[in-house]
Every structure is written in C-alpha cells, then in structure tokens.
C-alpha cells in the first residue's frame, strides 16, 4: 500500500494524519499516513529510507522545510519562490519533486472559502519569516493594488519584497512604517495577514489599530479552538471580518493530496469535522 507521512519537531500535535485519512476515505483512496518525529540532522536519512520502501510522499513542517528543499531532485516554481518545501513527491522515475502548497492553501481559503477579494486591494502582511515567503507568489498572482510587508527587522522584509518586485507593487519595511509618530503613513488596509506566530504565545505584533477600518478583512495564519488574540484585537477595532488559519492548513493538505493522488478532495466536511473536534 502507498504510504505517506508528515515529519517535524514537534509533531505530536499535527492534524495532517487525521486530515489525509479523511481525504482518503472521502475519495476512496487506499493509503496509509503517519507522523514521524525527527531530530535535527535526521531528515535526509529518514526521507531516503522512507522513499526506498512504499513511501510516495512526505509533508514537512517546521523545522525541516529547508532540509526538504535541499533534498529534492527538482523544485517546482512555487517551491523555488518560497525558498522552502512542505511537500515531497516520489515520481514514476523514482526522482523526488519538491513542492510548496502553503501559499495556495492560504489564497484558496481567502478567495474561495471566505470570499474575500485580493485583486485591486491594499494588503498588509505582518512578519517576514518562512510562512510569509511561501504565500507571496500566489498572492501577487491575484494582482493586489499594493502589498506592504512589515517586520521587526526591516531589512528582512525589504529583501523578501525585492524578490517579488517584478510582479507588482510590493515593498518591505519595519513596524515604524505604520506609525505616524515614527514618520510612517499609518494608512488603513483592505486585507491584513498575520504571518507571525505571536498568537501562539498570546501576544500581538506591534501594529497600530489605525491599519483597520470597518471594511478590513483580517487573517491570522495561526488557528485554535477559540478566536486567536490577533483576531480578537482586530474585532475589537472594528474589522469587517476575521479568520484563523485552519482553512490554510486544510487547503495546503488538499493541494498535497491532489499532487500525490490526482484527485481534489472536498475540504468543507473536513473543516467542519476539525472545528467540532477542537
């Protein structure tokens, strides 16, 4: 039987085995999906052993996305633009393709599930880490009017924006760009995406409420049983809509499943089941 797995550290909390098991049942695919905890330096050996057997694909979570990027024999355009791999695919000739489905998972959630518009909109992205790098190609393909990436280290945001400058109006800056007191513009945005992990620790990124209006749609890549701290903050300052990252998680998993099996699962019942189980 074809086997798949997700690797990371930590990994016990991963919902990927549950998600892919539901996808397999829904689409009547025969497969096994497990999780494996790896220590730093163990990725290459584990992947080689897995693919030498019945292994057909691996999902990769932190901190091994760079290891997977280096392990792949070939990289997709999405993986190249992200600089990271979250999905490995064993092809018919035995070679390994590296893919990144994080960005398409997020964009599909925003445009298809939430029905928010990105085209022609002003978009603020908070953070400039690996999670943000993975979403910029599909985001820029939506033709937003303007994208501003803000990060504690301004140079990191600037470097990230520069990689996608040929695709449209995108720039990077420090958090001070949003503060009138520090000479910034302090303007409002149509869509705000939190790509930091601050909500996991109950914290907030240092951005002013003035970025939100009563038409702003606010997305936190983090998810949980309750609205995240970033969502609550946005709601308290009058945002029109807020969402957490569960749809992104299920969406990137659905894209991985499609790349592996050639069938697109319906994510709606899986989303509903995960919400009920939280």
From Swiss-Prot:
This is Shikimate dehydrogenase (NADP(+)). InterPro entries: Aminoacid_DH-like_N_sf, NAD(P)-bd_dom_sf, SDH_C, Shikimate_DH, Shikimate_DH-bd_N, Shikimate_DH_fam, Shikm_DH/Glu-tRNA_Rdtase. GO terms for cellular component: cytosol. Disulfide bonds: none annotated. PANTHER family: BIFUNCTIONAL 3-DEHYDROQUINATE DEHYDRATASE_SHIKIMATE DEHYDROGENASE, CHLOROPLASTIC (PTHR21089:SF1), SHIKIMATE DEHYDROGENASE (PTHR21089). Shikimate binds at residues 14-16, 61, 86, 102, 223. GO terms for molecular function: NADP binding; shikimate 3-dehydrogenase (NADP+) activity. The active site is at 65 (proton acceptor). Belongs to the shikimate dehydrogenase family. Involved in the biosynthesis of the chorismate, which leads to the biosynthesis of aromatic amino acids. Catalyzes the reversible NADPH linked reduction of 3-dehydroshikimate (DHSA) to yield shikimate (SA). It holds the Pfam family SDH_C. GO terms for biological process: amino acid biosynthetic process; aromatic amino acid family biosynthetic process; chorismate biosynthetic process; shikimate metabolic process. Its EC number is 1.1.1.25. The gene is aroE. Homodimer. It comes from Saccharophagus degradans (strain 2-40 / ATCC 43961 / DSM 17024). Coiled coil: none annotated. It catalyses: shikimate + NADP(+) = 3-dehydroshikimate + NADPH + H(+). NADP(+) binds at residues 127-131, 151-156, 221, 245.
